[in-house]
């Protein structure tokens, strides 16, 4: 009889701190076993991310998403909104982990032990998996929002401050999903 207890660790990461538009999206993942190919989502091609996201969803013991909407980002600031989204992801897990590891330097307020790990998305498989799930979901959302708010190019730049996006902002003005507290959006509104 195996009396060894498995410690359940959830990895958490965010996507979308820097863009001028859209929500910040987080994921929390508890892995059953290692999955080959996991690394920081930014180091993977879209095709690799999509394939790994399917495997993570199939093979993980549990996963969940959290988010903070544009209004929350503008009201709280991106730092606090990100921590809120991380907490929401952990609380949405169908299984409570024994501890949580988060990519970055700060941890959300949780009732379970939590540790921040700088560059954790490259070092800890659970955080890598969370990074991939969050990135795939947010990218899909921005492609869908591109159809609702045409002309900004959200499907291509995902809301980041590219020259194309800045030019569209100047031409069209901000839409509902633009972060009013972010420059150059705030600069446009104040003119």
UniProtKB/Swiss-Prot annotation:
Gene3D superfamilies: Ribonuclease H-like superfamily/Ribonuclease H. Manganese or magnesium. Binds 1 divalent metal ion per monomer in the absence of substrate. May bind a second metal ion after substrate binding. GO terms for biological process: DNA replication, removal of RNA primer; mismatch repair. InterPro entries: RNase_HII, RNase_HII/HIII, RNase_HII/HIII_dom, RNaseH-like_sf, RNaseH_sf. It catalyses: Endonucleolytic cleavage to 5'-phosphomonoester. One of its GO terms (cellular component) is ribonuclease H2 complex. CDD domains: RNase_HII_bacteria_HII_like. It is an enzyme of class 3 (hydrolase). Residues 7-191 form the RNase H type-2 domain. A divalent metal cation binds at residues 13-14, 103. Its EC number is 3.1.26.4. GO terms for molecular function: manganese ion binding; RNA binding; RNA-DNA hybrid ribonuclease activity. Its cofactor is Mn(2+); Mg(2+). Keywords: Cytoplasm, Endonuclease, Hydrolase, Manganese, Metal-binding, Nuclease. PROSITE patterns: RNASE_H_2 (PS51975). Pfam families: RNase_HII. It is found in: Cytoplasm. Endonuclease that specifically degrades the RNA of RNA-DNA hybrids. Belongs to the RNase HII family. This is Ribonuclease HII. The gene is rnhB.
């Amino acid at each position: 009889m195996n009396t060894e207890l498995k410690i359940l660790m959830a990895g958490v990461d965010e996507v979308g701190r820097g863009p001028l538009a859209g929500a910040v999206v987080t994921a929390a993942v508890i892995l059953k076993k290692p999955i080959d190919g996991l690394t920081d989502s930014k180091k993977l091609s879209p095709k690799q991310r999509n394939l790994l996201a399917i495997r993570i969803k199939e093979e993980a013991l549990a996963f969940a998403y959290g988010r903070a909407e544009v209004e929350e980002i503008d009201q709280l600031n991106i730092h606090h909104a990100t921590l809120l989204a991380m907490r929401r992801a952990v609380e949405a897990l169908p299984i409570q982990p024994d501890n949580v590891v988060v990519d970055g330097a700060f941890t959300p307020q949780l009732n379970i032990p939590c540790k921040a790990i700088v560059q954790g998305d490259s070092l800890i498989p659970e955080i890598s998996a969370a990074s991939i799930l969050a990135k795939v979901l947010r990218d899909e959302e921005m492609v869908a929002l591109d159809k609702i708010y045409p002309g900004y190019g959200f499907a291509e730049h995902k809301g980041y401050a590219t020259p194309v996006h800045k030019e569209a902002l100047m031409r069209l003005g901000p839409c509902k999903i633009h972060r009013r507290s972010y420059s150059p959006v705030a600069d446009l509104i104040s003119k």
